[in-house]
Every structure is written in C-alpha cells, then in structure tokens.
From Swiss-Prot:
UniProt keywords, alphabetically: Ribonucleoprotein, Ribosomal protein
GO cellular component: ribonucleoprotein complex; ribosome
Positions in coiled-coil regions: none
GO biological process, one term: translation
Name of this protein: Small ribosomal subunit protein bS21
PANTHER family per record: MITOCHONDRIAL 28S RIBOSOMAL PROTEIN S21 (PTHR21109), SMALL RIBOSOMAL SUBUNIT PROTEIN BS21 (PTHR21109:SF22)
Amino acid sequence: MTTIRLKENEPVEVALRRFRREIERTGLIKELRARTAYEKPTTERKRKKAAAVSRTRKRLRSQMLPKKLY
C-alpha cells in the first residue's frame, strides 16, 4: 500500500500531487484498470507482443540517422 507523510506546513494539494505521482510510479492505476475486466491469456499475450514490437520500432527510429542533413 502506498502511503505518504504530510510534511509540516505542506498544503494538501501538494501532498495529493505527491501521492498521485507515487501511485503512478508504482503502476497501481494501470494494474487496477487491467483488472476491471477479464482478459483472455491469448489476448494478453497478443497485446504484450504488440507493445514490445512498438517499443522496438520506436527505439530503432530514434537510433537511425536522417538520410540527408541539408
């Protein structure tokens, strides 16, 4: 469970922002959204494979040099 401690004289809005950032970093929101509905194992594998291909293409695109620089 994610917890934060309020610092002395810290506004609630700032503490809430820190809490949201911490939740985002741990991936809790993403996991909760994934668990709202059942996903078949084949669909999950297919989705993860597509994400991996997308990440690889993005990485390759960033490493490629432009054809001409003029």
